[in-house]
């Protein structure tokens, strides 16, 4: 029932059947996963995490056709996107997979049974707090492979802990970081520019209809620019299609509270 030690033949088969070509880094991630009971794949938007998962799932279903697979993510939206993008029939929220619900004091109640799966893949791990991670690790049985996928540069969970970053920092878990942003026909400039900014290359930003940069010297000036752009946008678009994302809830001139005032 174990996975083949030599993944090269399986990689060739899956790339051919799926009609895609992996980068060397993506192939390295697949090889790492194949020989690791616990492993991590990280990368920013558009770096090929989903493509890598598609190959992993294709290989697993071929070499272990009777193996139970569980895909999970912290939120309903993330789990639906995971199922759609990988082509797997179903993905669950972590709470549902673990049989958990929160009481009025935000304590987890419910399930205690081990996860009935041979391969567990969890996406958007940066959103998982310490308590949910503890429940997940407690329920994974010996012999079950656990693959964690996420972007360490995303905002950490609302709850306590920065689980993904701490797992990476410990240096004990096999990890591959995908660091090449692939330009696809419909790629968002926001995703591409996020990668560029992470690389510290502010001079190579791609500007267009979906990405503009409006400089401001003071926080108050920035807040006014945001409000001006918002008011202009809602005159041309449906009000429900326009959003403002602010870095803080109540701190500073550009907080959610001040902008709403």
Predicted regions located by residue number:
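Conserved nucleotide-binding/hydrolysis modules and their immediate coupling elements
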Residues: 18, 129, 261
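Conserved helicase motor core of P-loop NTPases
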Residues: 1-3, 9, 14, 32, ...
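Generic amphipathic alpha-helical segments used as scaffolds and interaction surfaces in large
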Residues: 17-21, 43-47, 69, 124, ...
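ASCE P-loop NTPase helicase motor core
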Residues: 27-30, 34-208
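Pre-Walker A segment
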Residues: 1-44
């Amino acid at each position: 029932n174990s996975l083949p030690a030599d993944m090269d033949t399986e990689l060739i088969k899956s790339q051919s059947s799926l009609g895609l070509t992996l980068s060397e880094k993506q192939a390295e991630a697949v090889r790492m996963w194949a020989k690791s009971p616990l492993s991590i794949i990280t990368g920013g938007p558009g770096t090929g995490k989903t493509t890598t998962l598609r190959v992993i799932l294709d290989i697993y279903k071929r070499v272990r056709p009777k193996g139970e697979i569980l895909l999970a993510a912290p939120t309903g939206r993330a789990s639906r996107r995971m199922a759609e993008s990988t082509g797997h029939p179903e993905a669950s929220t972590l709470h549902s997979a673990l049989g958990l619900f929160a009481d009025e004091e935000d304590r987890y109640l419910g399930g205690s049974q081990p996860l009935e799966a041979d391969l567990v893949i969890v996406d958007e791990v940066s959103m998982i707090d310490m308590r949910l991670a503890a429940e997940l690790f407690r329920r994974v049985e010996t012999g079950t492979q656990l693959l964690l996928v996420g972007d360490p540069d995303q905002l950490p969970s609302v709850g306590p802990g920065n689980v993904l970053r701490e797992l990476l920092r410990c240096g004990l878990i096999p990890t591959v970081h995908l660091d090449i942003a692939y330009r696809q026909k419909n790629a968002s400039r926001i995703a591409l520019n996020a990668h560029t900014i992470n690389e510290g290359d502010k001079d190579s930003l791609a500007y267009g209809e979906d990405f503009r940069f409006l400089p401001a010297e003071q926080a108050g000036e920035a807040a006014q620019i945001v409000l001006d752009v918002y008011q202009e946008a809602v005159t041309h678009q449906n009000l429900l299609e326009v959003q403002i994302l602010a870095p803080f809830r109540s701190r500073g001139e550009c907080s959610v509270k001040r902008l709403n005032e």
